[in-house]
């Protein structure tokens, strides 16, 4: 049985989710933030778009993140970054043309979910639920579903 890297099998072979553990969150936070800002740069996101995808942290908190002063991110923030990373990865699998993969979030989209607007607008306006929906969509497309 395969298990996630942030789970631990305790006595009785029950997997325990460690993602809420502050030590685990601290260990994951700095690399997650660096990855997020690299994706934000590739996608050409504004500061407002970045903050929206991160869950609207205070401006001072956002600037601390940019400076590398991260600490242990909230579980919600780590989840948001994980979703953005998953979307980015799926797009780069779907579209071998790196420029197209990176532009996709800003292109008008005919999918009914987006109503002709870019996926980025949907994600910025829709919060974490929209991030989940876009992640499911690109993963489904990657798996061959339209």
Language-model segments: which ranges?
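Non-transmembrane "mature" sequence context
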Residues: 1-146
């Amino acid at each position: 049985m395969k298990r996630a890297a942030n789970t631990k099998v305790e006595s009785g072979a029950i997997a325990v989710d460690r993602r809420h553990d502050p030590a685990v969150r601290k260990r994951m936070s700095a690399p997650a933030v660096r990855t997020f800002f690299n994706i934000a740069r590739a996608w050409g996101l504004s500061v407002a778009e970045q903050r929206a995808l991160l869950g609207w942290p205070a401006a001072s908190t956002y600037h601390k993140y940019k400076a590398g002063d991260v600490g242990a991110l909230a579980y919600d923030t780590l989840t948001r970054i994980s979703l953005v990373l998953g979307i980015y990865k799926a797009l780069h699998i779907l579209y071998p043309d790196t420029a197209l993969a990176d532009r996709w979030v800003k292109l008008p989209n005919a999918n009914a979910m987006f109503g002709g607007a870019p996926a980025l607008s949907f994600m910025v306006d829709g919060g974490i639920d929209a991030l989940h929906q876009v992640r499911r969509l690109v993963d489904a497309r990657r798996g061959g579903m339209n």
